[in-house]
Swiss-Prot record:
UniProt name for this protein: Acyl carrier protein 1, mitochondrial
Subunit structure: Complex I is composed of at least 49 different subunits.
GO terms classed as biological process: fatty acid biosynthetic process; mitochondrial electron transport, NADH to ubiquinone; proton transmembrane transport
Function: Carrier of the growing fatty acid chain in fatty acid biosynthesis. May be involved in the synthesis of short and medium chain fatty acids. Accessory and non-catalytic subunit of the mitochondrial membrane respiratory chain NADH dehydrogenase (Complex I), which functions in the transfer of electrons from NADH to the respiratory chain.
Keywords assigned by UniProt, alphabetized: Electron transport, Fatty acid biosynthesis, Fatty acid metabolism, Lipid biosynthesis, Lipid metabolism, Mitochondrion, Phosphopantetheine, Phosphoprotein, Respiratory chain, Transit peptide, Transport
Similarity field: Belongs to the acyl carrier protein (ACP) family.
Pathway assigned in UniProt: Lipid metabolism; fatty acid biosynthesis
PROSITE patterns in the record: CARRIER, PHOSPHOPANTETHEINE
Organism for this UniProt entry: Arabidopsis thaliana (Mouse-ear cress)
NCBIfam families in the record: acyl_carrier (TIGR00517), PRK00982.1-2 (NF002148)
Residue numbers of O-(pantetheine 4'-phosphoryl)serine PTMs: 79
Subcellular location: Mitochondrion
């Protein structure tokens, strides 16, 4: 134990604490309020971005993409293509969709609803 303490004493880096005065605290509080996630995406923004993701998929005819389109029935995509689209939607909105939920997303309308109702979509 003494050897451990001696080694740690030589390895530890001194930490300087920041002395925050009232003006700095007020400034940081302002920054925090701007960074909170209170400004949720509008439905129109979600619809536009989801449709753009689907239209940009190589196997999709962009003229067939609507908010109600079904990935397999209307666009002729297979299950792997659907997984790739859901992954692209996750990337677009910086979300991680759990597998159980991702398996249910098989149309633009379901993708739009999921993203719009997710509190962390951005």
């Amino acid at each position: 134990m003494a050897l451990r303490n001696a080694i740690l004493r030589h390895l530890r880096v001194p930490v300087q604490t920041l002395g925050l005065n009232q003006s700095k605290i007020g400034f940081l509080g302002t920054i925090r309020s701007f960074s909170s996630h209170d400004d949720h995406l509008s439905r129109e923004a979600v619809v536009d971005r989801v449709l753009d993701v689907v239209k940009s998929f190589p196997k999709v005819d962009p003229s067939k993409v609507t908010p109600e389109v079904h990935f397999q029935n209307d666009l002729g995509l297979d299950s792997l293509d659907t997984v790739e689209i859901v992954m692209a939607i996750e990337e677009e909105f910086k979300l991680e969709i759990p597998d159980k939920e991702a398996d249910k997303i098989d149309s633009c309308s379901l993708a739009i609803e999921y993203v719009y109702n997710h509190p962390m979509s951005s």
